[in-house]
UniProtKB/Swiss-Prot annotation:
It catalyses: Hydrolysis of proteins to small peptides in the presence of ATP and magnesium. alpha-casein is the usual test substrate. In the absence of ATP, only oligopeptides shorter than five residues are hydrolyzed (such as succinyl-Leu-Tyr-|-NHMec, and Leu-Tyr-Leu-|-Tyr-Trp, in which cleavage of the -Tyr-|-Leu- and -Tyr-|-Trp bonds also occurs). GO terms for biological process: protein quality control for misfolded or incompletely synthesized proteins. Belongs to the peptidase S14 family. It is found in: Cytoplasm. Keywords: Cytoplasm, Hydrolase, Protease, Serine protease. Fourteen ClpP subunits assemble into 2 heptameric rings which stack back to back to give a disk-like structure with a central cavity, resembling the structure of eukaryotic proteasomes. This is ATP-dependent Clp protease proteolytic subunit 1. It comes from Corynebacterium jeikeium (strain K411).
């Protein structure tokens, strides 16, 4: 258990925010997405010309929540530099690679994992058919966006994401998820 009190932890994140640093350090859900979107909007309103740094250590999470973050990243007039540290898996990988081209970084021991979206389905046969249609749309949309981010083909992304595919930081650079592997903040 951490010796930090919630107020101390909050003050650390507030100090980082003042430096235009946002941290995604958990699973992506609606609450986290709303918080990150609000932070991006606040910082871009304060100064639309200065970069925002988004540090990612996340196992992934909700596609819809992640897409809210992605859309806000693209909506913001400033560049969003992304940094993969620890784990950037699933939606974490997506957001890492969605950063501004040339400003996507991974620390040397980061692990990046890509896979196809997953979803639980239930209900009537008609409901399941609708959900399956939506799932197929989401899978294709995600593959197209990741292809755009990485320079890979949609077909290659679809093939490579059929199962969990793990990358070291260097492999992630070679694949196109990130532009740089860095060991020091001075390198970014």
């Amino acid at each position: 258990m951490s010796s930090e009190t919630p107020n101390h932890r909050d003050s650390v994140y507030e100090r980082l925010l003042r430096e235009r640093i946002i941290f995604l350090g958990s699973q992506v859900d609606d609450e986290i997405a709303n918080e990150l979107c609000a932070q991006i909007l606040l910082l871009s309103a304060e100064d639309p010309t200065r970069d925002i740094s988004l540090y990612i250590n996340s196992p992934g999470g909700s596609v819809t929540a992640g897409m809210a973050i992605y859309d806000t990243m693209k909506y913001a007039p400033c560049d969003i530099a992304t940094y993969g540290m620890g784990l950037a898996a699933s939606m974490g990988q997506f957001l890492l690679s969605a950063g501004t081209k040339g400003k996507r970084y991974a620390l040397p021991h980061a692990r990046i994992m890509m896979h196809q979206p997953s979803a639980g389905v239930g209900g009537t046969a008609a409901d399941i058919a609708i959900q399956a249609e939506q799932f197929a749309y989401t899978k294709r949309e995600m593959a197209e966006l990741i292809a755009e981010f990485t320079g890979q083909t949609v077909e290659q992304i679809t093939k490579d994401s059929d199962r969990d595919r793990w990358f070291t930081a260097q492999q992630a650079k070679e694949y196109g998820f990130v532009d740089h592997v860095i060991t020091s903040a001075k390198e970014s």
